[in-house]
Amino acid sequence: MSIEYYEVDDVDRVIKIVKEVLERFEFIEIAVLFGSILRRNFIRDIDVGLVVDREISFKEFNEVASTLEQTLNIPVDLVILNDAPPLIRFKALVEGIKIIVRDRKKLFYIISVSFMELKDMKEKLRILGIEETHT
């Protein structure tokens, strides 16, 4: 099995395309571009995080992912941040490029909740005597 890499030399173009595709889906409240595309030009996939206003079906998830992949011609790792672990959710929303934000208050609320969940986990690990790992 070989790993295929894709060159992305115009992140602004990717942002524009992702925004055009995702704006069609009304259930998407927040969309961010995060991960390796923010740090390098050669990538295996494009990480797109979504906050949705309701539970979405497998069919809807696949429709979003496949539309992005077909439009970009690059594999897309679509992450529903509502269900993601707190660290991934926090890093994506804080460090990622915001593409769609329909409700800024909700964005800040989710970031705050994620931060508090991380602090709670850190405290639980400290109480249990488990070393903290750095990511």
Task: Kindly give the residue locations of the regions a language model identified.
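Short beta-strand->loop micro-motif that forms the acidic, two-metal-ion catalytic signature
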Residues: V48-V51
